[in-house]
């Protein structure tokens, strides 16, 4: 899903905000699992929790903070997964 598609869903659907919140949680969990699998396969880690919490309710704030922090970088057609993965590597660096 792109940033534009997510914004449209959030505004047009009755439960759009709820749908996007759940979507972001899934993207966040998927990004962490994909990262962990890559590390197990020998890739250099880029997301390190180091004992800090990463909970489902944090997905939305990670996403929106990353969009605000780099507003000039992300275009509407960029995937939400990219934004959230970049947020995770920024907030949980190694």
Ranges and model annotations:
Residues 64-94:
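Short, compact, well-ordered microdomains
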Residues 1-65, 87:
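Short N-proximal segments of mature Sec-exported proteins
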């Amino acid at each position: 899903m792109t940033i534009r598609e997510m914004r449209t869903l959030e505004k047009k659907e009755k439960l759009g905000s709820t749908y996007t919140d759940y979507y972001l949680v899934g993207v966040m969990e998927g990004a962490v699992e994909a990262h962990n699998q890559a590390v197990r396969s020998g890739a250099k880690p880029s997301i390190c929790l180091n004992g800090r919490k990463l909970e489902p309710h944090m997905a939305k704030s990670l996403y929106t903070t990353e969009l605000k922090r780099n507003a000039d970088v992300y275009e509407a057609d960029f995937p939400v997964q990219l934004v959230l993965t970049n947020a995770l590597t920024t907030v949980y660096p190694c």
